Amino acid sequence: GADNIIIKQYFDGAGFQNFNINGTMINDLITTLHGSDSNDWMSAWSDNGVTIKGEGGNDTINGGNGDDILDGGTGNDWLYGGNGNDTYIFGKGYGNDTIEDWGGSSIVKLKDISSSEVTITNLWDSTLEMTVNGTEDKLTINGYKWNQGGYTFEFADGAVGTVNKDTWELE
């Protein structure tokens, strides 16, 4: 079965705390990280794919080299994908999230947003901004032209959008 490790009062320390767990490969075991309703900083610098859920608060989430799933949840979050083929989750009520991704092909799943509900803007010739019409929610992708694999957007209504360098297509 799945084992859990709970470290109580981990964040009460004055700085980073290190724990050694002998007899196991901890990177191979961790597949999902959950944040809290506070402002979290979470990182999974691993070559394995990890799911990281920020929950509430203004979170900073780092995916690493694997094919990760990053879900900031509510709050204004920064999502750093790393080098893998990453998937980002965004929905209504999520706030203002920002994605930075350095390589691979990226998927943005818009879990409850239809293609007709968004406005897409190209800012400063390298930043894509997707605003959910009628809300305060906004998804910003910094340096989207530098991600060599491009981005695929999967909308709740089944529509698929792609952006690669200077081209936006919606099917």
Task: Kindly label every feature range from the protein language model.
Residues 1-15, 39-125, 131-149, 154:
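Acidic, glycine-rich calcium-binding repeat modules characteristic of RTX/beta-roll
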Residues 16-28, 153-166:
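Repeat-associated, polar segments at repeat-unit boundaries in modular proteins
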Residues 27-42, 161-171:
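Disulfide-bonded cysteine-rich modules in secreted/extracellular proteins
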